[in-house]
Amino acid sequence: MMDLFKAIGLGLVVLLPLANPLTTVALFLGLAGNMNSAERNRQSYMASVYVFAIMMVAYYAGQLVMNTFGISIPGLRIAGGVIVAFIGFRMLFPQQKAHESPEAKSKSEELADEPTANIAFVPLAMPSTAGPGTIAMIISSASTVRHGGEFPDWVIMVAPPIIFLAVAVILWGCLRSSGAIMRLVGKGGIEAISRLMGFLLVCMGVQFIINGVLEIIKTYH
């Protein structure tokens, strides 16, 4: 049982900086300004469902994609590390706010024409929460745990859905409490937390690249 808790804790530590629910909260508040309470709650719930579904598909279909295109685990680690480090760098030194991204601007224009437009999938679930970095990390981690032998087989089967469900529930709770979070933390607090998470992501990405290079050296030495 301790192995299960360890796997869940490790998964949340890896995924939450990438998912970064607080950034999604700021984006949600910017896009849902004209929605009533019931519609906001519906969008929050649907965004969480979409995030869970995207993560599940990435985890279980990722290996199939790798095998189909002949992608090696070291190659995936290096590519995933580059993406994660790049996303972390952008969080550490942001060029634009979350609500200024192309996806958010496009959705804002759509909301101006149709106030009840769906914002749950784009941009809240993807790319804000379950974006390219999150998907790359999930696929890479799936390959690592399946071939690493660090956890028992039953933990590898049970832990991922629990981790993805926990991330989705955390996102749902943050979106439902978005107003209170913004009043408590403020925009400055969210930016500070995002920069800290960005630094962690840069470190994780660099470590992924190092592990990939070392595995290539070990394989072809």
Curated annotation (Swiss-Prot):
Residue ranges annotated as Periplasmic topological domain: 1-7, 67-68, 140-154, 218-221
Residue ranges that the UniProt entry lists as topological domain Cytoplasmic: 29-45, 90-118, 176-196
GO cellular component, one term: plasma membrane
Pfam families: MarC
Membrane topology: Multi-pass membrane protein
Keyword Cell inner membrane carried by entry: yes
InterPro entries xrefs: Multi_antbiot-R_MarC
Domain of life, per lineage: Bacteria
Transmembrane region(s): 8-28, 46-66, 69-89, 119-139, 155-175, 197-217
Primary localization: membrane
Keyword list, A-Z: Cell inner membrane, Cell membrane, Membrane, Transmembrane, Transmembrane helix
UniProt name for this protein: UPF0056 inner membrane protein MarC
Taxonomic source organism: Salmonella paratyphi A (strain ATCC 9150 / SARB42)
Top-level taxonomy: Bacteria, Pseudomonadati, Pseudomonadota, Gammaproteobacteria, Enterobacterales
UniProt gene name: marC
